[in-house]
Design a protein with these regions (language model features):
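Flavin-dependent oxidoreductase catalytic cores
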Residues: 1-269
Length: 269
């Protein structure tokens, strides 16, 4: 199946990439068959579910799974992988002090909270070197709420990612279980967010969600000013996550126009 997809992409002269990651606490026992895992034990209201903090001895095997995912992606014909280390999924749950309350060497200081990410990147980069696969990392510029990762700390994480010689960092932001609108912006899609929830939770979200979920007003290119700070701090290629302008036609326009002269943008695709 996937080989057919990548084959068709290659036939048209393009390269194919796929995102790899683990959702951590953004799962549910009905989906994964067991209590979801995370950096620390707790409760995720978004799912909703109780989650189990991973044991120290489980972490190396989880990191190796990221490496195996690179091999599987290559076997399926993909030229690149994007390691998801943002948006409040598993690697992000280790990085963020909001979800990482560990007392061992994987929690506490930023250096400790980056330890699991480093383990995963080591496995990914070894697999990438063996298979000739390019590697991108999706990274949070900020979590979007008090008590989460802010830009200064995030830049330090990005510098650590850069040290692993990845091909580029995809800059994004937001934490799905706490500040989902930091990613999407604008009106909160309450009915869509609660569609698959149990009846009791659906009612709770629809009545209380607008008061509990932080709003982030929409503005065009809303990540751009923060992304510039990362451009100043890093040397590797950065991919800016954008959205259509209000006209809804920016992607068509830029694909047929030369990139604007800019000190931080090399090209638009």
């Amino acid at each position: 199946g996937l080989r057919e997809v990548t084959g068709a992409i290659h036939t048209e002269g393009a390269a194919a990439g796929i995102q790899i990651g683990h959702c951590g606490n953004m799962s549910h026992k009905k989906i994964c068959g067991t209590t979801p895992i995370s950096a620390s034990t707790g409760f995720n209201l978004y799912s909703p579910t109780f989650v189990r903090g991973m044991k120290k001895e489980e972490l190396p095997e989880m990191a190796r799974a990221y490496g195996r995912a690179v091999h599987l992606a290559r076997e399926a014909g993909f030229d690149a992988v994007e390691v998801h280390a943002g948006h409040g999924y598993l690697i992000s749950q280790f990085l963020s002090p909001y979800t990482n309350h560990r007392k061992d060497e994987y929690g506490g200081s930023l250096d400790n909270r980056m330890r699991f990410m480093r383990m995963c990147l080591e496995e990914v980069m070894n697999a990438a070197a063996a298979t000739g696969t390019s590697v991108l990392v999706k990274h949070n510029m900020y979590d979007g709420f008090k008590g989460g990762i802010e830009i200064p700390e995030s830049i330090e994480i990005a510098r650590e990612i850069e040290r692993w010689k990845v091909n580029g960092i995809v800059l994004s932001g937001g934490f799905v279980s706490k500040a989902p609108m930091a990613v999407m912006r604008g009106l909160i899609p309450i009915y869509t967010m609660s569609y698959y929830s149990p009846l009791w939770l659906r009612a709770f979200i629809r009545y209380c969600g607008p008061f509990m979920i932080r709003q982030f007003p929409f503005s065009e290119c809303y990540f751009l000013e923060d992304a510039k700070k990362f451009r100043e701090a890093l040397q590797l290629p950065l991919i800016y996550v954008g959205v259509p302008l209000k006209s809804g036609s920016i992607f068509f326009k830029v694909s047929h126009s030369p990139a604007p002269a800019s000190p931080f943008c090399e090209r638009l695709i």
